[in-house]
Amino acid sequence: MSRGAAAALPYVRRRAPGGGSPCGAGGAPGPGGPRSGGGDGSHATCPQGDGSHAKCPRGAPIGAPSGHNGRVSTTSLPSPDHAAELRSALLAAGFTADGLLDLLGAPAYAALARSETVPALRATRGAGDAPLAVLVRLFLLQQSVPYAHAEAALPVGVALADGWLLREGESVRATVDVRPYAGPDADADAGDGTGGDWFVVSDLGCAVGGAGGIGGRGREPGTEVVLGVGGASTTLAGITVPLPVGSALDLGTGSGLQALHAAQHATRVTATDVNPRALEFTRLTLALSGAPDAELLTGSLFDPVGDATYDLIVSNPPFVISPGARLTYRDGGMGGDDLCRTLVQEAGAHLNPGGYAQFLGNWQHVEGEDWHDRVRSWVPRGCDAWIVQRDVQDVTQYAELWLRDAGDHHSDPAEYARRYEAWLDEFEARKTRSVGFGWITLRRTDAAEPSIVVEEWPHSVEQPLGGTVLAHFARQDYLRRHDDASLLEGYFLLAHEVVQEQVGTPGAEDPEHVVLRQNRGMRRATKVDTVGAGFAGVCDGSLSAGRILDAIAQLVQEDPVVLRDRTPEAIRMLVEQGFLEPVAHPEG
């Protein structure tokens, strides 16, 4: 199978040609946004493909069998006591992200991301009772398999005793979903020489998300479902800064994906959730992935950690703006976007100096109010911020999205209409016209003049973006330290991923316009004039900005003083957006 084909599939370590993003973390080539299961815009309902797009709801359970009855584990959860032995068996059978791709092939693997399992069932049927095929049927397709076949694939006695499997006569079935996963930092060592071959453990039928098709059937009353890996969670993992840190907090951990990533570069990891079952699933995810244990605390928002501070805080919170807290995994129990606001406002007090907090969120677009101002007002004192809106939905689209997620579109038409009305009543009462989706990153700086960038970027991006986030704040530091005069004394390098495009009539002496375009990261594009294009093209770090402008002034026969006076703003923009990188003086 070609590496290019692999790039369109979720949860696979293989990279596209040219060092593309790991699949499932989001990336090129589709136009970018929060919630797809595919890493490159390949999700059937997501034109953007980084997991944050509004049209890719949590309610698209990957791998839940067609016609699945929505059964969720009702027995006590498995014990992690022999997780290392089970992990060894799974890896020996090739039950990894890449192994799945090799077994199923690209079409069947991609179909799982669309909740279509027939192609995968056919593929495993052809593999007979091979251990990998048996494990796929057990843990991904959630089929009962003959005891003898399971015995050949894994230590079935241990799996039964510890509660991973349940025996039914001469067959066994899985009690939880176990999903191979390889994320943005999957090249990290898991401690056993297997690199980033990880496993995320969640409730059956909930590998990616949503209550649609679950509806509480097969669950004890009051049992809260715990979802597995979804587009939103892989997006957050992809934008998280890749820094070695002393302490990390995964707030609202769910099945533990962010805690698993944090464990690769944090000395100490704390994970919290209001749902005690989620913490048990996190324990299983960490153990089965060969990751260190985390501190697991029950409670809402920052309540469980008191006044503790961290170097890194991450959260994929229950941010859905809904008329009631029906589903804990998505509804935070606060009105409107108050949960996201509270999370952002309180995060600053829990960050160590230089620490980062990164969240996904929703925010209301309220009549008579600029949404930029709304979310900017959330930023706590002492923090820089970068807030990126990736998508917007009007209130009808938003309501329909989450009604489908909850499976309400399968309910009685009158009940569906009643619930739809409740959503619209809620939005009308709050004067909400639409809802934005996006990313929020804070950095604790205690600067006198904080940098707060709030922007809309609904276009294609290439994950992972953690390094891009770090570079953004480094550039903000540079610009904060340099006024226009010192900017002209600086040295710059055209970023290696930037290309120049010229558009104009064939045969014309000059182009109508020139565009600088990034082919990696945020994939920004900006129109520049001939001076800007010439300036950027000459920036190789050997000449100061002022000397370059003086040379250009001679070429275009312009007063160098005038050119120096009007150009710093353009240089500042090119630096801020990552087209130019500040470098040290070539002579030190």
Describe every region a protein language model picked out.
Residues G222, G230-S315, I321:
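Conserved SAM/SAH cofactor-binding pocket of Class I
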Residues M1-G67:
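Compositionally biased, low-complexity flexible segments
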Residues A130-D177, T235-G238, R268, L442, ...:
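Long, charge-rich, low-complexity alpha-helical segments
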Residues V274-N275, G336-Q389:
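Conserved Class I SAM-dependent methyltransferase catalytic core
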Residues P276, P317-T342:
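Mobile active-site "lid"/loop adjacent to the S-adenosyl-L-methionine
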Residues H68, S73-V134, R179, G183, ...:
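Acidic, low-complexity/disordered tracts enriched in E/D and polar residues
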Residues V395-F473:
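Flexible, glycine-/basic-rich loop-and-beta segments that form/coincide
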Residues E168-A248, T253-H261:
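SAM-dependent Rossmann-like transferase core, predominantly class I methyltransferases
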